[in-house]
């Protein structure tokens, strides 16, 4: 094996590693925010739009990228199914809702 083959393989390996480091938005984990954080983000968004750095400056401990990702996941139609799955799985451990009275005669 000559040097050009080794260099070519090394370069291909580096390209493959770089490609695998990228994370698709489909693989994002949901970001949990407190009600206060959600309220602040919504109010700030109405004031300044998608200036995530300004919004993050008002939400302690949150990065602009994190807030933008939260906003996309919360408001995008593409994540509607994931939101429903997350919502339904969080309510599986609660008691099922039963009406106080039956609409059917006993």
Swiss-Prot record:
Upper lineage: Eukaryota, Viridiplantae, Streptophyta, Embryophyta, Tracheophyta
Name under which the protein is recorded: Transcription factor TRY
Induction and repression of expression: Negative autoregulation. Repressed by CPC.
Its job: Transcription factor. Involved in epidermal cell fate specification. Negative regulator of trichome development, including endoreplication, by lateral inhibition involving intercellular interactions. Promotes the formation of hair developing cells (trichoblasts) in H position in root epidermis, probably by inhibiting non-hair cell (atrichoblasts) formation.
Chain segments carrying region Disordered: 83-106
GO biological process assignments: fruit development; regulation of DNA-templated transcription; regulation of trichome patterning; trichome branching
Signal peptide: none
Record's subcellular location: Nucleus
């Amino acid at each position: 094996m000559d040097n050009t083959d080794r260099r070519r393989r090394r370069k291909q390996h580096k390209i493959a590693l770089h490609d695998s480091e990228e994370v698709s938005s489909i693989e994002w984990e949901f970001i949990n925010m407190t009600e206060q954080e959600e309220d602040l983000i919504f109010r700030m968004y109405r004031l300044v739009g998608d200036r995530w750095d300004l919004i993050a400056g008002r939400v302690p401990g949150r990065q602009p990228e994190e807030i933008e990702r939260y906003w996309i996941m919360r408001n995008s139609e593409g994540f509607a199914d994931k939101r429903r799955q997350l919502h339904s799985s969080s309510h599986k451990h609660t008691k099922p809702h039963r009406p106080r009275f039956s609409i059917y005669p006993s």
